[in-house]
Amino acid sequence: MKTNELADILNEFAPVSLQEKWDNAGLLIDNENSYITGVLLCLDVTEKVVDEAIQKKCNFILAHHPLIFKGLTKITQHTYTERCVRKAIQHNIAIYAAHTNMDVVMNG
């Protein structure tokens, strides 16, 4: 299965259109529709989570809380968000968040 296919399935179950206005659910980092080698589930994307995905050869992280809530103005090494984004891109890891859209669907 490819990244976009799993993202479509997740969006069918918990449509991004149902998220709160302040939220940022959906495919936050795309890995160019690569074939999925493994999926790592987490509550929050942290540097340890990205490192675990690399170690376990998972190239898709499914998180409840979005890593990116507001627009990034730069990607440096100064914040954990910037470091996670940079490392995920370097290792071809997609990150998908299902937050308030998942909270409001039945069985979500």
Kindly give the residue locations of the regions a language model identified.
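Hydrophobic structural segments
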Residues: 1-108
